[in-house]
């Protein structure tokens, strides 16, 4: 592929929380913005303000005080196609400033995505945006590429969904994939709830964004939850303060680690599921006995919800406790893991061997949207 931006492939990782988009071959996404579509709650009264009927991404975020914010992607799966189209339109025309009809486009999807969902994505890309070629790749597999491996088990935890995906020699093993509908957004909700216990009230969609910021800046994973709780109760050494947009300062203590602890103990938010360490172990146990050793030695973390300080050590401790005692266990936590899905997509789309994998407009016209199941696995 040429080096100029004229025919370069585009890579768009549509997460539940953030859209990461850019050009194949780059080492980081050029555009990262929230997957939000906002609509005004009030009637416009000033003439000539050029008010729009909807706002996308950062613009929606900055005007959140007067908007109702909606996320079109829930639990990694697109639920609102009209809003999703707005997000893609915004990605191509406003963020990347490209004409989609000139660029092959690589999209990502959650593992175990419904079939109808992939078809609809394919259809919108070819019929609404007229892309010349496209491909849909599984997010966790791309994260593994980004870490330079072809075998390993990926814990991909984003804003909407968490997966354990074992990959062997580049193939995801679908029977062993574990999906957990517990991720960053649920942790934000839980933090909103436990802050209410302290007497701080966060209710609106705009206030939720403030809590998300508190979570990202102050939360961490405790190595030993009970010990940490005791420390928090007996001293104020773990307390941190945070200034709200209106200048009010709030203090948070054990909430800092109680919030992400939910990943290991989903019962905190009333979920019956096993924690992320157990789902990782269960996923490995569903794989062939001969490849387990390779999976234990290559636990790759990916996604924004794995960015908490202390999470790798805690995973190491928990999986070591579950695994056979002689097993070598390694948790790989790349520093750029927030964007590793996108980076993997960028690597994949710029490989010369990948160029015959694209679904072309011609193939789509001949076979229709179902072509995606034949060409993208």
Curated annotation (Swiss-Prot):
Residues the record lists as N6-methyllysine modifications: 86
Residues recorded with modification N-acetylcysteine: 2
EC number: 3.6.4.-
Keywords linked to the UniProt accession: Acetylation, ATP-binding, Cytoplasm, Cytoskeleton, Hydrolase, Methylation, Muscle protein, Nucleotide-binding, Oxidation
Tissue expression pattern: Predominantly expressed in skeletal muscle. Lower levels in heart.
Methionine (R)-sulfoxide: residues bearing it: 46, 49
Broad EC category: hydrolase
Subcellular location: Cytoplasm, Cytoskeleton
GO cellular component: cytoplasm; cytoskeleton
Modified residues (N-acetylaspartate): 3
Catalysed reaction, written as an equation: ATP + H2O = ADP + phosphate + H(+)
Any Pfam family hit: Actin
Function comment: Actins are highly conserved proteins that are involved in various types of cell motility and are ubiquitously expressed in all eukaryotic cells.
PANTHER family from the UniProt entry: ACTIN (PTHR11937)
Note: In vertebrates 3 main groups of actin isoforms, alpha, beta and gamma have been identified. The alpha actins are found in muscle tissues and are a major constituent of the contractile apparatus. The beta and gamma actins coexist in most cell types as components of the cytoskeleton and as mediators of internal cell motility. There are two different alpha-skeletal actins in Fugu rubripes.
Subunit structure, as described in the record: Polymerization of globular actin (G-actin) leads to a structural filament (F-actin) in the form of a two-stranded helix. Each actin can bind to 4 others.
Entry similarity comment: Belongs to the actin family.
Name of the molecule in the record: Actin, alpha skeletal muscle A
């Amino acid at each position: 592929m040429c080096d100029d931006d004229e025919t370069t492939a585009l890579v768009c990782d549509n997460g539940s929380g953030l859209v990461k988009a850019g050009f194949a071959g780059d080492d980081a996404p050029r555009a990262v913005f929230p997957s939000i579509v906002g609509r005004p709650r009030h009637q416009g009264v000033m003439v000539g303000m050029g008010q729009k009927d909807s706002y996308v991404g950062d613009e929606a975020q900055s005007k959140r005080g007067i908007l109702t914010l909606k996320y079109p992607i829930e639990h990694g799966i697109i639920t609102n196609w009209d809003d999703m189209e707005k997000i893609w339109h915004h990605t191509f025309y406003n963020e990347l400033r490209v004409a989609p009809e000139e660029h092959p486009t690589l999209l990502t999807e959650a593992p175990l995505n419904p079939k109808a969902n992939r078809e609809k994505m394919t259809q919108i890309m070819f019929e609404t945006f007229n892309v010349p070629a496209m491909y849909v790749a599984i997010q966790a597999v791309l994260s593994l590429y980004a870490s330079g491996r072809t075998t390993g088990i990926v814990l991909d935890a984003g804003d909407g969904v968490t997966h354990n995906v074992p990959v062997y020699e580049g193939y995801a093993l679908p029977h062993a994939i574990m999906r957990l509908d517990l991720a960053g957004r649920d942790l934000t909700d839980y933090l909103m709830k436990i802050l209410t216990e302290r007497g701080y009230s966060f209710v609106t969609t705009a206030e939720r964004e403030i809590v998300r910021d508190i979570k990202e800046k102050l939360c961490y994973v405790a190595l030993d939850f009970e010990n940490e709780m005791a420390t928090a109760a007996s001293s104020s050494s773990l307390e941190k303060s945070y200034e709200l947009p209106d200048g009010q300062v709030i203090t948070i203590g054990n909430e800092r680690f109680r919030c992400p602890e939910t990943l290991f103990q989903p019962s905190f938010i009333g979920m019956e599921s096993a924690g992320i360490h157990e789902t990782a172990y269960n996923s490995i146990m569903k794989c062939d006995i001969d490849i387990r050793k390779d999976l234990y030695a290559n636990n790759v973390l990916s996604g924004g919800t794995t960015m908490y300080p202390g999470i790798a050590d805690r995973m190491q401790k928990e999986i070591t406790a579950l695994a056979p005692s002689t097993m070598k266990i390694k948790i790989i936590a790349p520093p750029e893991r927030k964007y590793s899905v996108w980076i993997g997509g960028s690597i994949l789309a710029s490989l010369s061997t990948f160029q015959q994998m694209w679904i072309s407009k011609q193939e789509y016209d001949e076979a229709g949207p179902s072509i995606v199941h034949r060409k993208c696995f």
